[in-house]
């Protein structure tokens, strides 16, 4: 069907008809070229250099004294080189701890993707790099050691803190739907990518914390 003929609520809405290449989950592992652009990610017009997206990982339960967790591991390829990813996720009262160990050889960008939604509301604010943006905004922040998302309505604050500086990119995930009023865009959530330029032959460690709290 032609959305324009069905009564589109905005012109050019067909530009937003983009089909995802994978399921929108979290802790998704990407390998990109150095020259990847945010708009290419938004439109799914980029080349994935690794084969980890959509592939199964080996799952192992971790029993720690102060937390429960899981370890996920997989051997795959990145730019034609053998790479192994080991990631552990520990669940604590204060939040989540994520640790990565990447072994092999790669020159480019490694990115971890999170997809978040606060009851489908586009109005919680993202505070990163001295800027405040809405969840429905796109943004790219360089050299970030920590950032947080604040939802006044839910009285909730979600903070990410990294062991070393990363670039944080985010953009809205929207669907194009037909309602009684016509064809329109509907906000579903926001994709966050934690980007790290890496050039190694051996191993690389990365880690971050996710903490939960109230708005103060």
Roles of regions detected by a PLM:
Residues 31, 35, 40-105, 145-216:
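Beta-strand-rich recognition/accessory modules
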Residues 22-32, 39-42, 87, 110-116:
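Long, contiguous hydrophobic alpha-helical segments, chiefly transmembrane helices and signal peptides
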């Amino acid at each position: 069907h032609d959305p324009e003929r069905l009564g589109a609520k905005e012109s050019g809405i067909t530009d937003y008809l983009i089909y995802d290449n994978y399921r929108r989950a979290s802790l998704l592992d990407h390998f990109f070229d150095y020259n990847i652009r945010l708009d290419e990610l938004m439109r799914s017009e980029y080349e994935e250099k690794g084969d980890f997206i959509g592939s199964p990982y080996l799952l192992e339960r971790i029993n720690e004294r102060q937390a429960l967790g899981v370890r996920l591991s997989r051997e795959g390829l990145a730019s034609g080189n053998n790479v192994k990813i080991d990631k552990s996720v520990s669940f604590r009262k204060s939040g989540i701890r994520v640790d990565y160990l990447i072994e092999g050889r790669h020159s480019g960008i490694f990115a971890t993707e999170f997809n978040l939604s606060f009851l489908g509301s586009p109005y919680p604010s993202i505070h990163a790099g001295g800027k405040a943006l809405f969840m429905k905004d796109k943004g790219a922040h360089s050299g970030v050691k920590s950032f947080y998302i604040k939802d006044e309505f839910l009285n909730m604050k979600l903070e990410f803190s990294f062991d070393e500086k990363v670039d944080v990119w985010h953009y809205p995930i929207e669907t194009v739907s037909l309602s009684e009023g016509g064809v329109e865009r509907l906000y579903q959530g926001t994709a966050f990518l934690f980007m790290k330029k890496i050039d190694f032959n051996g191993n690389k460690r990365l880690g971050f914390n996710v903490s939960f709290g109230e708005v103060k």
